[in-house]
UniProtKB/Swiss-Prot annotation:
It holds the Pfam family PHD. This is Multicopy suppressor of chk1 protein 1. One of its GO terms (biological process) is transcription initiation-coupled chromatin remodeling. It comes from Schizosaccharomyces pombe (strain 972 / ATCC 24843). The keyword rRNA processing does not apply. Residues 475-645 form the JmjC domain. The keyword Nucleus applies. It is found in: Nucleus. Residues 38-60, 385-412, 848-872, 1319-1341 are annotated as: Disordered. One of its GO terms (cellular component) is nucleus.
Length: 1588
């Protein structure tokens, strides 16, 4: 398994669930033994075999055994026998009935038969490989042989050593065999030592052995095998020990220490409790639970009472769960549990000797074994010549045949005569395949004194494993699966209606799954109950079968008995259930037939009763087997012989034969079972009644008490068989005896005994009578059959035949006459189906009154029509000929029914009609004559050729009349024409016909017209002339009325709007502009036309003219900075401009410029409300601010200054005196020349906008004001200092106006600076005046604010999100080419206040030279203020752009991340815990999900310094065009109030630095610094939100 790379991944491994195995993708054919060629003799073997045959025999060369896919080979006679059966689908569906036929035909002689399912039969494999587990044992073939492990010489020596002592020491060592290396002759000598009889028992590999693997830990049963398997799996997954024990304890719901200590105790010391009941009876399951004891139960070990006790099903002893000897057998069924004392030592298997496996681990082990075997097989075949030694003389044939080996052992003194012929062995092995040769050579070395070329199983080769899972299946067990009710489903084969064992208790005869590996062989075996065996190969490589036929079974048993020691012969039950593997050469030498064949996947093998077989696996295989029974099991006395054998040997059988017979007699109601049951039951009832009569004579005083049928069944204490019919019990005891062994169990007295009778004498006779009665039902049915069909002249009705068939199906009568009746009914039903087709009637089959039996073949034939009838329904047939055929068939029927008379009468009428019709065909007919003959033919209700001819003649005549009517009408529709053409095609008219050709041409013209109309109506714009043309063409063709109505409707609407649009367009081109329509009128007409689905062509022209007018309006909006506003805003803003210009350009008198502030109205003595102030030229209102230089009063509202932000001693300089103070504006001020161009373009507009007159007034007013200024200031160069009030006066008016007077404004500002300088530099030339109001929040910013208010986002997250949106907007703005106008950018009102204080402060201002940038950008802060100085070095991360390597090439400056870029608000950052440096997520290969799981982070540099490997891939970002003034340290991104204040503080510092930069002559490297210090701080909305 794959190793995990980290501890986190290891903890996620689950040892409870096994790896998944996909059998569909698993390539079994890649194994070396899955190919067919390895099951064939090799070329080298054939040559060696031929050479050996030439040397050893004179009969000629011997041919190798062929691995024919279809036949089996008899290894004794070399005869080929066909054991392969490929049934059809019908035969395969019969199930057990088909198997019974196979047994009589093939299997009885050969012992086994291969059944190949039909091609479409493929049962799915339903094993869950993630949970399926099974027991495995090492399957070394040498350990299963009496010959290889324990040679006869050694056994004889052991018997001589022990003498007559039956009790053998358990701790004695095994006999050892020393072999000499002599090439001439090998003699085996045995060192005689005491041996362990338990180890000798193990070679028999009993299938009923029990694995002792369970222990109790804190009152809970724990499987040691399961823990051992999980421990091996955890080692493969590199799982830590504490993690393994934690998962195991969680599964068992125990603490870790208790579970681990308990496992280690048994794993290290191997503690077990063995009892000495070596000769005890084997485990047998009673048919039902034993009776409850009357006395209070007590534990056998602690002698204490208790409620939680478990009872042994054999000795009836009670145990506490905590007192049970450990390890013990599993509690799979609490009623069939066996204690350790009752399990014979030969059947006990400790948990260390076996293993649990899963499919994946077993498959891996199989592949390893196959790989090792692939390497050793060629060398074995090359180095082991299968020939006799060169110095060994071949004895003559007579001597070889008479060669015998006789061994005598003391003790029992038995003699064994076994044929061991080395020559025969070599010949046999040369005829086998390479794999078989390797198996039989290495697994069974010869024990003869002659030299042997064979050796034991190679130690370097892994021992194959054998897996078994009892009481489980790989067949579907879900009702939703199609194979659930399949008769070949092994899991449910016992419940088949033909199975005699379907009434046995559940859980007795269950299926077993076997998993094999290369060289796996289970030993010779047969069913101990002489049952049939069904073996299905689910998946995997081929399996080689070796079968001993039933006739040679006694020979094999005698040979096995002769090979067994005396103490084994004394226990024949051990041999009955054993699996001993004897070499096939030994069997053939003793005259025992052995058949061999190959089984592939998806094939069945059926074994007969008393047949011995073994299977050699050639690779990984998964198969399933189950014992079952057919009627032959009881008829052929297999069942009775098996139960008699169990009874004679005193072995407990798994169930009772009496129960099987009586259950089939009383519960089964079919005649089928009565036939084979009648004879068997008669013999059993006679024997039972005879035994009861004799018993009553010997014990007349015993009381006979009836017992219920469902009561418990007890076994006889002497013969161990179930006393089902009658039993003898003590009143106060637990011993039970049958009627035959009363004296053996109760020899003394009869006083306390009672006979319990389940079936009394009358009940037995009644059961037999019912069986006989069911069997005689067939005779009764035969009498009725003979009465109905017995005589030759009798013609029974169909009703009588159906009654006979229903009776036969009810009683399941297996008679040949039933098939005859079924065929007659089927033939009659087919005739009736044809009759119903002719006369257009429903099937005359009547429904049965009762529900038919499931799977009944008769009812399926009656209820479903035949294939012939279906063909008649699906095709046009000649019913006249069919009626004649029916009449001919009915004349041959031997039965009668009413429909036959109707058919005869109809046939006579048909004959008369045909004669008359044929006579009329020879002359011309009128329409009336043709109509009469057609009506006469239709009255017969039959399809005849004559009737069809006259119908076509009439239809052609009618078609011509219809065509003439359509061609003459003007309103014919397309549907009528299509219907007419279809009628003509049906009656056989082609395009060669003149009328048909005309109809097709008319259809083509109509379709073209419809396509033109549909295409025109689908367009958005229509041509009215084209519509009128199409309408006129509709009168001469066949049209679609719905399409014509739609055309008329569109034409009517388009005609009305066409007139309006033509008039609108012609007026828009009128030379007189004021005669042109207004824009509102054009909008109204186009809005009405918008509702049209198809618009006229003039609509597009009018829409373009309207768009041209809208473009003029949009141009005006853009001039005032309202590009995104609706069109109506242009008119509204012009009204605002007109009002502002009127106030600003008002004539205030010739002396107004020379009066300032309070002095003016104090001196004049006038009302202050009559005078104007500020640049808005409005009277005094609200709070007013006085300029410290010109002493003009300004509205605080106009300057956007609040009373809260002003101090009493604060100084103010107006924008007129200091050009650097900006005037707050809500919109752009377009130059006058642009507005004049718009007025000049008015005559070119197609429609009249409503803004025309308003725009003209605004422009006219501005021109008049300009002329007035130029008249007063004729020559600007002649202005002097005394004209400063005049310049200030007009500058206020120019700033208050909403129109930009470019020349006047620039000239007056230059002159004013010349006469009264305030700023260190003259004002720059301005060519535009834009709005400086704060932007409104975007849609995204409003959504973020709503999320913060609703609580979905915190204030810090909201601030970061808003800053990120501004960063994107600014990046988009930077991507456009522009010039950074640092020195011409006006300042905000918040920066204007500090500059006003500095202007009127007595301290001199710093010069421009002092503010030039130095090598370290942080030094720029030292010349500003102490407050800003704090932000120089310690807060360089706040102004991240100042220490960026993109700006200053300072080697000592700290590096930011790996990408050398600053941090933005939207970036994710992480800090190293060693160097405390910050990094971007993506630069160091991290993400937010990864960072959330880290407790400590080390950067790549720190990892390299410590000698560690950095676990992530670094991906430094490229250098984009970033907005450096938005780079902040990661601490600012946390969103706290202190960080937000610190951020605002840094923005203020950068803005102040920008204000004091020099004008010109800056170094080249200063452009970057100037770019950083530009006033690009967040807008006022974001600043306000961050302050929140």
């Amino acid at each position: 398994m794959r190793k995990n790379s980290s501890h986190e991944n290891q903890s996620s491994e689950n040892i409870i669930e096994f790896p998944y195995v996909d059998f569909e993708e698993l390539n079994v054919h890649s194994n070396i033994f899955s190919e067919l060629e390895h099951a064939k003799p090799s070329t080298q073997q054939q040559q060696q075999q031929q050479n050996i045959s030439n040397e050893t025999t004179s009969t000629g060369p011997r041919i190798c055994i062929s691995r024919d896919e279809f036949k089996a080979v008899n290894l004794l006679t070399k005869e080929e026998i066909n054991v392969r059966v490929t049934p059809k689908k019908e035969e395969f569906s019969r199930g057990l009935d088909f198997i019974s036929d196979l047994y009589d035909q093939t299997a009885r002689k050969s012992g086994a038969v291969r059944v190949i399912p039909p091609d479409n039969w493929k049962c799915p494999l339903t094993i869950n490989t993630t949970t399926f587990k099974f027991l495995t044992r090492k399957n070394n073939p040498s350990s299963m042989s009496l010959v290889s492990n324990y040679p006869l010489d050694a056994i004889s020596s052991q018997q001589k050593f022990h003498g007559n002592d039956k009790t053998l020491e358990k701790n004695s060592a095994k006999a050892t065999i020393n072999k000499s290396n002599s090439t001439a002759e090998t003699s085996s000598t045995a060192t005689v030592e005491p041996y362990d009889s338990n180890d000798l028992y193990r070679i028999f590999d009993r299938p009923d052995a029990v694995v002792l693997s369970y222990i109790f830990v804190l009152g809970k049963a724990v499987d040691l095998l399961q823990i051992k398997q999980w421990l091996q799996l955890s080692k493969q997954k590199n799982l830590l020990e504490f993690e393994f024990w934690s998962q195991a304890a969680q599964h068992y719901k125990l603490d870790v220490n208790s579970l681990r200590n308990a496992y280690n105790l048994y794993a290290e010391t191997g503690v077990t409790t063995r009892t000495g009941n070596d000769g005890g009876s084997p485990i047998n399951r009673p048919a039902k639970r034993v009776k409850r004891q009357n006395h209070i139960p007590k534990c056998k070990l602690c002698a204490q009472e208790g409620s939680s006790l478990v009872t042994c099903c054999i000795c009836q002893s009670n145990y506490h769960y905590a007192c049970v000897e450990a390890p013990f057998a599993p509690f799979s069924d609490i009623h069939y549990w066996t204690c350790n004392s009752c399990i014979p030592s030969s059947l006990k298997i400790l948990w260390k000797e076996v293993d649990y496996h899963c499919i994946s681990s077993f498959l891996q082990s199989s592949n390893e074994l196959a790989s090792s075997l692939k390497k050793q097989l060629p060398s074995f075949l090359a180095q082991t010549p299968l020939t006799l030694p060169s110095n060994t003389k071949t004895p003559p044939a007579s001597a070889r045949q008479s060669s015998r080996r006789t061994r005598s052992t003391s003790g029992k003194g038995f003699e064994t005569k076994i044929s061991i012929n080395l020559d025969s062995d070599i010949k046999l092995l040369n005829t086998l395949s390479p794999l078989e040769t390797f198996f039989w050579c290495c697994s069974f070395p010869s024990t003869a004194s002659t030299s042997s070329p064979f050796s034991y199983y190679p130690e370097s080769l892994p021992t194959p494993l054998l897996g078994r899972a009892v009481n489980t299946t790989a067949f579907p067990t879900s009702r939703q699966n199609a194979y659930y009710n399949d008769p070949w489903n092994l899991y449910f084969i016992h419940f088949s209606k033909l199975s005699p064992l379907r009434f046995t208790p559940p859980g007795i005869l269950t299926s077993t799954i076997s998993l094999g590996q290369p060289l796996t062989c289970q030993g010779w075996q047969r069913d101990s109950m002489s049952l049939f065996g069904m073996h299905y190969h689910h998946y995997g490589a081929q399996r080689i079968w070796y079968v001993i036929p039933e006739v040679d079974g006694p020979k094999y048993e005698k040979l096995l008995n002769d090979l067994s020691p005396s103490f084994i012969q004394e226990k024949p039950e051990t041999l009955i259930k054993s699996k001993i593997l004897l070499p096939i050469s030994m069997l053939i030498s003793n005259g025992i037939q052995v058949l061999t064949f190959v089984q592939n996947s998806n094939e069945f093998v059926i074994t007969s009763p008393n047949t011995y077989y073994t299977v050699l696996d050639t690779g990984f295989s998964l198969s399933e087997s189950v014992p079952f029974a057919t009627k032959e099991w009881i008829q052929d006395m297999h069942a009775e012989n098996s139960f008699n054998m169990y009874k004679n040997l005193h072995i407990s059988a798994p169930f009772s034969l009496d129960h099987i017979l009586l259950a089939n007699a009383t519960l089964d109601k079919t005649v089928h079972s009565a036939y084979w049951l009648m004879t068997c039951l008669k013999d059993r009832v006679d024997r039972e009644l005879t035994l009861r009569n004799e018993f009553r004579k010997r014990h007349p005083l015993l009381t006979w008490i009836p017992t219920p049928l469902e009561s418990s069944v007890m076994a006889c204490a002497f013969c161990k068989t179930f006393a089902y019919l009658a039993s003898i019990e003590e009143k106060n005891g637990t011993k039970t005896a049958c009627l035959s062994h009363k004296d053996e169990c109760f020899p003394n007295t009869d006083s306390d005994l009672t006979v319990l009778v389940r079936y009394d004498d009358n009940a037995l006779l009644a059961a037999y009578s019912k069986v006989v009665e069911r069997a005689h039902k067939a005779d009764t049915w035969l009498e009725n059959y003979k009465e109905a069909l017995g005589s030759d002249n009798s013609r029974p009705s169909l009703k009588v035949l159906k009654t006979l068939l229903n009776e036969a199906e009810t009683i399941c009568c297996p008679l040949q006459e039933v098939s005859l009746v079924r065929n007659l009914v089927k033939t009659a039903q087919q005739w009736l189906d044809k009759f119903a087709i002719i006369f257009k009637k429903k099937s005359m089959v009547k429904k049965e009154k009762r529900k038919p039996k499931r799977g009944s073949a008769t009812h399926s034939h009656l209820e479903s029509p035949s294939e012939e009838v279906e063909d008649l329904n699906s095709s046009n047939i000649n019913e006249a000929d069919l009626l004649i055929n029916l009449v001919e068939e009915a004349e041959q029927f031997t039965f009668d029914f009413p429909e036959m008379a109707v058919a005869f009468e109809k046939a006579e009428s048909l004959k008369i009609f045909r004669e008359k019709a044929n006579a009329m065909k020879e002359r011309s007919l009128s329409y009336e004559e043709c109509l009469a003959i057609v009506e006469e033919g239709e009255s017969l209700q039959l399809k005849t050729p004559e009737l069809l001819y006259f119908k076509q003649y009439m239809e052609k005549t009618e078609w011509i009349d219809s065509f003439n009517q359509i061609s003459q009408k003007t309103d014919s529709t397309m549907e009528e024409l299509v219907e007419l053409i279809e009628r003509g095609e049906k009656i056989g008219l082609t395009s060669d016909n003149e009328n048909m050709a005309t109809a097709l041409l008319l259809k083509e013209k109509s379709e073209n017209w419809m396509k033109q109309v549909e295409g025109l109506l689908s367009q958005e714009t229509l041509s009215t002339s084209k519509l009128f043309q199409l309408k006129s063409e509709a009168n001469s063709i066949c049209i679609n009325r719905g399409l014509l109505e739609q055309l008329n409707e569109v034409l009517q609407k388009s005609e009305n709007f066409h007139t309006q649009l033509v008039s609108l367009i012609s007026r828009a081109r009128d030379p007189d502009y004021y005669s042109r329509p207004t824009i509102e009128e054009a909008k109204t007409v186009l809005a009405e036309s918008e509702n049209l689905t198809n618009k006229p062509e003039e609509y597009t022209v009018a829409q373009k003219l309207l768009t041209q007018t809208y473009e003029w309006v949009r141009r005006g909006k853009r001039l005032f900075g309202k590009a995104n506003a609706p069109l109506e805003i242009f008119n509204q803003h012009l009204e605002f401009v007109e009002q502002r210009n009127t106030n600003a350009m008002v004539d205030e008198g010739s002396d107004a410029p020379f009066h300032v502030g309070n002095e003016y109205y104090v001196i004049a003595g006038s009302d202050p409300s009559d005078f104007h102030y500020c640049f808005c030229r409005q009277p005094e209102a609200g709070m007013m601010i006085e300029c410290e230089l010109c002493h003009e009063w300004y509205h605080a509202k106009c300057m956007k200054m609040s009373k809260k932000k002003l101090r009493a001693d604060e100084k103010f300089i107006c924008p007129i005196c200091d050009y650097r103070v900006e005037v707050p504006r809500h919109s752009h001020r377009p130059p006058l020349i642009e507005l004049q161009k718009m007025v000049d373009d008015i005559p070119t507009l197609p429609f009249q906008p409503i803004e025309i007159e308003l725009l003209k007034r605004v422009v006219k007013q501005a021109e008049e004001f300009k002329n007035k200024m130029q008249s007063e200031v004729c020559d600007p160069t002649q202005l002097s200092e005394k004209d400063v009030p005049l310049l200030q006066f007009y500058l206020r008016k120019l700033e208050g106006s909403e129109i930009l007077f470019t020349e006047e404004l620039n000239v007056f500002r230059q002159k004013l600076h010349e006469f009264m300088p305030v700023a260190p530099q003259p004002p720059p030339f301005i060519g535009e005046s834009r709005s400086n109001r704060k932007p409104r929040p975007t849609k995204r910013q409003r959504e973020i604010m709503e999320q913060v208010e609703s609580g979905k986002l915190t204030s810090a997250e909201g601030a970061a999100a808003i800053a990120a949106t501004q960063t994107r907007n600014q990046n988009n703005f930077i991507s456009k080419p522009f010039n950074v106008h640092t020195l011409s950018t006006t300042l905000s009102p918040w920066a204007m206040k500090s500059l006003a204080q500095a202007a009127i402060s007595p301290n001199p201002m710093p010069s421009a030279h002092d503010l030039l940038p130095t090598s370290n950008p942080a030094e720029l802060f030292t010349n500003i203020s102490p407050e800003i100085k704090e932000l120089s070095v310690d807060s360089t991360s706040t102004l991240g752009g100042l220490n960026s390597s993109h700006l200053v090439s300072d080697q000592n400056a700290s590096v930011i991340c790996l990408c050398r870029q600053p941090f933005a608000i939207s970036d994710g950052t992480v800090q190293c815990h060693n160097c405390l440096e910050w990094f971007h997520y993506e630069c160091v290969g991290l993400s937010s999900d990864i960072v959330s799981t880290l407790s400590n982070y080390a950067c790549p540099d720190c990892c390299s310094k410590e000698g560690k490997l950095y676990p992530w891939n670094t991906r430094p970002r490229s250098t984009p065009s970033v907005w450096l003034s938005q780079a902040y340290s990661p601490s600012v991104l946390q969103g706290t109030t202190e960080n937000v204040a610190f951020l605002n503080k840094a923005f203020s510092a950068s803005a102040n630095l920008f204000d004091v930069l020099p004008v010109s002559n800056t170094p080249s490297h200063f452009s970057k610094m100037d770019y950083v210090l530009e006033d690009r701080k967040p807008d006022l909305f974001t600043e306000t939100y961050l302050s929140m």
